[in-house]
């Protein structure tokens, strides 16, 4: 087990993230899904260059809700992270001149995100605790967990995890429970993630049966990974023009 403090100036960073960084809390989902897609795209690149020789079957990002546990989870089967990766990209945030920068750009969320790569930390806007469970594509590397309650302190442990990739588990704040509603999450995914190049899955498709909607066995894929502008006109169907 490893415990420690994140970076050197995060005592100043977290209140900004929690209260001021984003005027619209829904942005967190876009940021986390974007990171998950990036992890999958990086795996494809490693495969193309011969650095990864494993399977590329069924690459996807999955969003799941557990109302009873109060959690929202974003899962990808991309490159994953080693313990060193987590320490480098999550714990050791190198904020050169962070205080001065935040003072200058505290009203401009996009500038801060672009400058520091703070996308992951947007999770704390809606969460009282965030967990990472991840396993690298690199053979022999143990899976690790990372847990933080929004303070600068974190805890890391080796864990058992069979599959490659990363789970980001958000323990949703009591005053942010709207993000445990599937209809709300699906609407946000369609708004921000409709044209991403990796399947984004939110639960199962539903059908009307015996007076109510029930889940089918088919994944509810939010996005279109082959948009019409990438197709030849001769290959388009009537419904393509409608959708």
Model-identified regions with their sequence ranges:
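GHKL/Bergerat-fold ATPase module in large chromosome/replication-associated machines
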Residues: 112, 130-153, 174-176, 183-243
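GHKL (Bergerat-fold) ATPase N-terminal catalytic module, capturing the glycine-rich phosphate-binding loop
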Residues: 1-174, 178-179, 187
């Amino acid at each position: 087990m490893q415990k420690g403090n994140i970076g050197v100036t995060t005592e100043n960073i977290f209140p900004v993230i929690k209260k001021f960084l984003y005027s619209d809390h829904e942005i967190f989902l876009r940021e986390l899904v974007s990171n998950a897609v990036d992890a999958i795209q990086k795996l494809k690149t490693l495969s193309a260059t011969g650095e990864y020789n494993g399977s590329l079957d069924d690459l996807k990002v999955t969003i799941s809700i557990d109302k009873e546990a109060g959690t929202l989870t974003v899962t990808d089967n991309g490159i994953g992270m080693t313990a060193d990766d987590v320490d480098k990209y999550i714990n050791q945030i190198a904020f050169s001149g962070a205080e001065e920068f935040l003072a200058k750009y505290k009203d401009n969320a996009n500038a801060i995100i672009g400058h520091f790569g703070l996308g992951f930390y947007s999770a704390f806007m809606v969460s009282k605790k965030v967990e990472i469970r991840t396993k690298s594509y690199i053979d022999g590397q143990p899976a690790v967990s990372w847990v933080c309650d929004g303070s600068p302190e974190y805890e890391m442990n080796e864990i058992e995890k069979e599959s490659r990739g990363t789970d980001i588990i958000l323990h949703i704040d009591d005053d942010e429970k709207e993000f445990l509603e599937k209809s709300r999450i699906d609407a946000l995914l369609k708004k921000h993630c409709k044209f991403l190049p990796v399947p984004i899955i939110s639960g199962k498709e539903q059908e009307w049966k015996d007076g109510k909607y029930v889940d089918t066995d088919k994944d509810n894929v939010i996005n279109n990974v082959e948009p019409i502008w990438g197709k030849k006109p001769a290959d388009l169907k009537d419904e393509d023009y409608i959708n």
